[in-house]
A protein has these predicted regions:
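Amphipathic alpha-helical scaffolding segments comprising HEAT/armadillo-like alpha-solenoid repeats
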Residues: 2-15, 36-48, 67-79
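Alpha-helical segment of the N-proximal tetratricopeptide repeat
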Residues: 12, 17-34
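Short coil turns that connect the paired helices of HEAT/ARM alpha-solenoid repeats
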Residues: 14-20, 47-53, 80-86
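Structural signature of alpha-helical solenoid repeat scaffolds
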Residues: 32, 63, 96-97
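Generic detector of contiguous secondary-structure segments
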Residues: 52-63
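Short, intrinsically disordered, charge-balanced linker/junction segments flanking boundaries
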Residues: 88-98
Length: 98
């Protein structure tokens, strides 16, 4: 069982733009595997990042989690016209599959 503090440490790595992208992706995939509200919250915080590739993977991973609690996050991303088309497209695909 992973503690709340461990989830927070993983989440901090994900949202830290000073971390190498490889470490941030590892954190994302770890959170995806853990699932739950804490993981969804940390993943949702990362949508303000500058990396389009990371944000695309955030949406993809939220969809892979198959957790209805992620739907409002994905809808917000889809409706956010400041998000890149590739990111919004992935959020739309995930929502259609739900």
């Amino acid at each position: 069982m992973v503690t709340e503090q461990e989830v927070e440490a993983i989440g901090q790595t994900l949202v830290d733009p000073q971390q190498p992208l490889q470490a941030r992706f590892r954190a994302l995939f770890t959170l995806r595997g853990l699932g739950g509200p804490g993981a969804i919250a940390w993943i949702s915080r990362a949508f303000s990042d500058d990396s389009v590739l990371l944000k695309h993977e955030l949406a993809y991973c939220l969809g892979q989690m198959q957790d209805r609690q992620a739907i409002p996050v994905l809808v917000d991303v889809l409706c956010d016209t400041h998000q890149e088309p590739m990111v919004r497209h992935e959020a739309a695909l995930v929502n259609m599959a739900q």
